[in-house]
Amino acid sequence: MEQVSENVIVYYPGDPIGDEASGTVKIALVGSSSYDPSGVHDWERKFIEGVKYYADRSMNSKTGLVMFKNLNYSILCGKAANPMQNPQMDPNNPEFITKMSSNLDFCDAADGIIFNFLKKSQSPTPLMLFGHLVKTGKMICKCPQEYFSYPLVKLMCERYQVPLYPGKMVSVLLMLQGLFTLPAFQQVQQFNLPE
């Protein structure tokens, strides 16, 4: 667990979700991951930094965005803080079991799931996890059209009414706003207009 700001806590595979997460908006980050040392494709870290920026800024009444005001976030990051020493998909590989179990646990506990496919990913694991989560009603998806299974992802998103964001012009702010279309986030915000 890592406290990245007053309003944002990050959990990684193997971290138990403790009492400090109660009363927070829980966002699971799952999908393709990259351990490229340059960090160019580290979308999870970029998302965490973006949430930190908007959460911290929302504390300021002059510059904050109303929809993020007074919210605390728990980011349930499916990417291990360090690359797995043994990334083999094997039921006897404890690192693989911990990562996959954490991904499933994080998604179960989350109010919203951001599922991201990296353009060059060829791993079958994110696609399998996507198929498992697509019907949850609490997911939004980012998938570039160049992804090898984009037609399947698009079809599943349309069928189960999952918001799909293609392309590289998708920002953290746009993804956060997309989460607020989900029922759990609408309940958290309780934006009820008087009748």
Positions of the model-derived regions?
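Conserved catalytic or regulatory cores that recognize and/or transform ribose-phosphate-containing ligands
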Residues: 1-195
